[in-house]
From Swiss-Prot:
[4Fe-4S] cluster 2 binds at C387, C416, C419, C422. Its cofactor is [4Fe-4S] cluster. It is a peripheral membrane protein. InterPro entries: 4Fe4S_Fe-S-bd (IPR017896), 4Fe4S_Fe_S_CS (IPR017900), Ion_transpt_RnfC/RsxC (IPR010208), Nuo51_FMN-bd (IPR011538), Nuo51_FMN-bd_sf (IPR037225), RnfC_N (IPR026902), Soluble_ligand-bd (IPR019554). GO terms for molecular function: 4 iron, 4 sulfur cluster binding; electron transfer activity; metal ion binding. Keywords: 4Fe-4S, Cell inner membrane, Cell membrane, Electron transport, Iron, Iron-sulfur, Membrane, Metal-binding, Repeat, Translocase, Transport. Binds 2 [4Fe-4S] clusters per subunit. This is Ion-translocating oxidoreductase complex subunit C. Residues 369-397, 407-436 form the 4Fe-4S ferredoxin-type domain. Belongs to the 4Fe4S bacterial-type ferredoxin family. RnfC subfamily. Residues 602-714 are annotated as: Disordered.
Amino acid sequence: MLKLFSAFRKNKIWDFNGGIHPPEMKTQSNGTPLRQVPLAQRFVIPLKQHIGAEGELCVSVGDKVLRGQPLTRGRGKMLPVHAPTSGTVTAIAPHSTAHPSALAELSVIIDADGEDCWIPRDGWDDYRSRSREELIERIHQFGVAGLGGAGFPTGVKLQGGGDKIETLIINAAECEPYITADDRLMQDCAAQVVEGIRILAHILQPREILIGIEDNKPQAISMLRAVLADSHDITLRVIPTKYPSGGAKQLTYILTGKQVPHGGRSSDIGVLMQNVGTAYAVKRAVIDGEPITERVVTLTGEAIARPGNVWARLGTPVRHLLNDAGFCPSADQMVIMGGPLMGFTLPWLDVPVVKITNCLLAPSANELGEPQEEQSCIRCSACADACPADLLPQQLYWFSKGQQHDKATTHNIADCIECGACAWVCPSNIPLVQYFRQEKAEIAAIRQEEKRAAEAKARFEARQARLEREKAARLERHKSAAVQPAAKDKDAIAAALARVKEKQAQATQPIVIKAGERPDNSAIIAAREARKAQARAKQAELQQTNDAATVADPRKTAVEAAIARAKARKLEQQQANAEPEEQVDPRKAAVEAAIARAKARKLEQQQANAEPEQQVDPRKAAVEAAIARAKARKLEQQQANAEPEEQVDPRKAAVEAAIARAKARKLEQQQANAEPEEQVDPRKAAVEAAIARAKARKLEQQQANAEPEEQIDPRKAAVAAAIARVQAKKAAQQKVVNED
């Protein structure tokens, strides 16, 4: 009982939702054996006959080629194409190809020489001793692609399967009306097809191998069973005729009961599917050493006198095949490449045969009926009932017309297999498949644009990151290459630092400055030299950084230099021609001189006779004495050279002169006799003394260079001097009396 249940489970057939049963129309072409077609005079071989990018050209115009010679190189997913016959390459130019849009694609045009010479062929009869990688590479380089209609490179598909394939399915359903290419191939070449299946099984090592074939092909079923009579590793499954049972997802579910997930592939559930024609091409590539240069094409339709299946060379113009079959076109004759449900109408008959061409249908006007006008959707849901992918064609139709791409994507328009079942049952004659094809093309274009935008953004961000890295590296180089202080500057800095440390260590020792001795300014000078060295190093580093960051403009530099020279000349001119705007008032000068002399005498007298109550700061005393002497000399000089406009009171002048002399003597006495109570900084003392000497020299210079503007009256001067002497003597006597 368990064995019976297992056998029933093993041979069980599942059924998918939807599907239709259109007229088969297969008897027109499946009754005659395969035949060869005479060679055409010219062949057009498009470089791209598969899903993916076109290969790289390896021939040039004027080259002689042999049948099977590669015309392109296959790298990665790029599949090569081969010469269908021997001849000469006459052109490499765009040419219309087998596509609904009939767009021109780059093609190699070969003029046949009629000899049909092959390249040297190297078959692998011992393919079982070859590695998996070697077999896949040979299949790929010999140009084998899916011949069921998709055109996916077989080598890439086998490589992607890897070790996760448990079930290998051979699609022999061929469910679309009129097409009998696979049926006739299995009838005439069943042994070769099975041998190709064994090569695929050797590569994939699946757990089971299934051949799915519809029950409307009794002769092909008989031939396969005869070949598989002694085989137990390959199982032939006969399934009911239903369109589109030949779809990859539909046949997978029929044979295994497994459903391919939305947006996924059959390999995701451990299943890999190949077409009958692909298995035959694999056998010829591996065992016979022949690249794919021809395939079986069905020529059918009431407009063809001799329908049947022929071996058509790739690149043969459609017109040549139809004429050989007795094509009798009507006034508005159409030719369909493919079947009536999934095929497309050719715009002209110069289109070449490619790897995915399985049928050329030339129906009469009565065969397909008059074209019906498209009407509005009545929402009958017949399309949803017929859809084998469980989609909602009515909703997808509205989304496609309204260009609502997001909603169309959400409703899984990508899962549409474009079988045409929905359009077949539509009572409003709406060409739903055309809308879906256009919508998928627009979505693909949008995604391609988004991909390019993302790549451009990634390139921009990478460029920004590279610029940031280069900037950081450049700044690091500038920092490391900055000019260091010269050797002598380093020595000066080190010496200054050593002296500073020594001074700090000796800070507790008192510093005594003796009168008349010159202070030691070596530490100050060394520190100043060190600061200058540091400034020079810093300036050099700044200059180098500025030079590295910005290159100076020579014109701007020249202009600035010219402006500087002009300013210098202007200043020299002003200094040479300038005259003092204000004159010194002689009366005020005489008064100030008299006052200064009086203050000096008074200070001298007080200093000579009095004992200081407080200690005097020698630094301040020296500075004040120098300032007083300078002022006295300046006033005397001004008084000698200037003529006062008004008379000066001689008594006041004598008093002021005496006071000035007294102050001066007092300051000198205090400086000579006083001992400082506090320690004096020698550096500050030296600086103050230098300032006082500089001011005194400046005043002497001004007094020596001054020119009197007016003459002084000698009589008045004599009177003033006499009065001053009298007053001075009187003051001295009075002072002596006071002391006694």
